[in-house]
Amino acid sequence: MRIRPILALMTAASLIFAACGGTTSQAPSTAPSQAASSEPSSAPSTAPSTAPEAATVRLQLQWVPQAQFAGYFAAQAEGYYADENLTVELLDGGPTIIPQQVGSAPDGPEFTISWVPKVLEARETGGSDLVDIAQMFARSGTLSVMWADSGLTGPCDLAGKKVGVWDFGNEFEVTAGLGKCGYSPGLENNGDPTSQYQKVIQAFDMVAFLNRDIDAAEAMIYNEYAQVLEATNPTTGNLYQPEDLTVINWNSQRVAMLQDAIFARASWLAEGNNRDVAVRFVRASIRGWIYCRDNPGECVNTVLAAGTALGAGHQTWQMNEINALIWPNQYGIGILDPVFWQQTVRVSKGAGIITTNPPSAAYDQSIVQEATAGLADQNLKGDGFVKGTVTPTPGGE
């Protein structure tokens, strides 16, 4: 794949992103003032003036090494964690690893990457004390894709159809979106084809969709959607094109929910100087994401060196899409959007993921605020960010 520059000096359209506050409401209330340079920096250089106390920590990733986590790999490779006197072990995820469960264990990793609704569910039903300390993704990357020649045009066309989803909490946006149409799963149990659909647990790939075994497939814009575009259309002999597909972007359906965030256990944060360790970890990680925004090609190489299973072309696509989920953010990277938080809670309650509003203890913006205060000379908002254009390659090679 080829990627064009993704940062230009132009005025970015304003997006509504605000910070956290409040006590027991379902949303933070005010947005802190964040200083941000309008000029990008190719290598964020801010580091502590004196060496802080050394610490060794672990970060549980949601999946295997890929550009979804490029900022953390970059923070390690570029020495940003070392600048904070941190030794960081990046723990691979996978189909059998549930990060919010691993991270909730008393002896679990100090930091965890997970989606907000999964953690809210774990807090309510599993006694987790995970806290969102840095909301890295400002937008959801979840799609559902259908074949354009099927005549299906949107979620309310899926009654009586086979709808692929992933489990372990990855399905929440899809099932919530279909719920807005008045549809529920259960068609496979002699259900009503006018108000129910067959919920098919999809493998973490697009094989069933490409074989037309399901009518709609869940896909991340940075991963499985690209896998379809990297596959050969047997009719034409060429790669599938976007016009071959009908795409439901759950952001536009107002059921998207907050995704990748850095979580830490409240009990761990309360011990010793662990909160300071968290500030340093978040600061170094943000430097890694700034580096990947400004140097996407270098970050792709870093991810490939980490042992990713998919090729350079696929990781280039993914890096481009991941950057677009993070940047721009009106109030700065890592700051929680109160409107999106409210939507996440509303959709989670409506879908039965949680039954009550989460307490204010579910998030703590003070850590990311302190971390970014030490990066005031950086372009924390991504002002001028422009998403690049990437051309899919066969098999993502």
Residue ranges and their predicted role:
Residues 1-18:
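Sec-dependent bacterial lipoprotein signal peptides
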Residues 17, 21-30:
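Bacterial lipoprotein signal-peptidase II cleavage site
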Residues 33-60:
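N-terminal low-complexity, Pro/Thr/Ser-rich intrinsically disordered segments
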Residues 51-203, 211, 215-222, 242, ...:
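Short, glycine-/small- and polar/acidic-enriched structural segments
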Residues 117, 150, 204-208, 212-308:
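Pocket-lining segment of extracytoplasmic ligand-binding domains
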Residues 185-197, 237-245, 275-276, 307-323, ...:
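Short, surface-exposed acidic
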Residues 272-355:
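Secondary-structure end/capping motifs
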Residues 342-397:
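Conserved C-terminal helix/tail region of periplasmic/extracytoplasmic solute-binding proteins
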